[in-house]
Amino acid sequence: MEDPEKKLNQKSDGKPRKVRFKISSSYSGRVLKQVFEDGQELESPKEEYPHSFLQESLETMDGVYGSGEVPRPQMCSPKLTAQRISVFREGNAYTLAGGQPRFNDYKANDHKPLPIIDFGKIIIYTNNLKIIRTPMDKRDFVRKILQKEEEAEEESLMNKEESYGGRDQHDRPLVEAESTLPQNRYTQEGDIPEDSCFHCRGSGSATCSLCHGSKFSMLANRFKESYRALRCPACNENGLQPCQICNQ
């Protein structure tokens, strides 16, 4: 009468069987124990490997059986399916690589569902956090520059008033006296003499034709704060120049 294990082996020779798990040596890499999906075991003969250290130890482990024992039905971990398990020897104890659970240590909590990946989202990993400011509008930039320029002009006028406050009116510059006195006199009287110049109205000074009284050079860059240092070379500090019609 034939052995039932031989019959099972003959039936399975024609069709490859799926391996449930295998135990191999971490030193030589040879397969020490192999269990198929149908519960059959394929174990290396002891005579071929006389120094095998797993023969006696694995027979005493719970949940792992020898060649003569029939496996009992139990829940098996899906983690052990089609995975390679490495056994390491530490003295007289045998451990599994990577802290993998034993065959009878399976719990329901061991099989956790994979996290759901949210598609359509962009995740940025960074090691520094900085405040990203919105770019300044061109109008706001020009307005800021003009505001600074007005403040600078007000400060310069205040300094001039303070410096001229203790002086007499006759000590003021000649150009300023010519630009203020005759024009104010004519405007107060309301009449302009017929022989006066229509360009300067008899004051002898007119607004600069290059800068139009802004006192800034045409070569100045309006988008930089350094343009205040570039003055118009054709007029004085008040933005006036001698009348060209009167000087002819």
From Swiss-Prot:
One of its GO terms (cellular component) is stereocilium shaft. One of its GO terms (biological process) is sensory perception of sound. Required for hearing. Plays a role in maintaining cochlear stereocilia bundles that are involved in sound detection. Ensures the restriction of TPRN to the basal region of stereocilia in hair cells. It is found in: Cell projection, Stereocilium. Residues 1-16, 157-172 have a biased composition (Basic and acidic residues). The gene is GRXCR2. Belongs to the GRXCR2 family. This is Glutaredoxin domain-containing cysteine-rich protein 2.
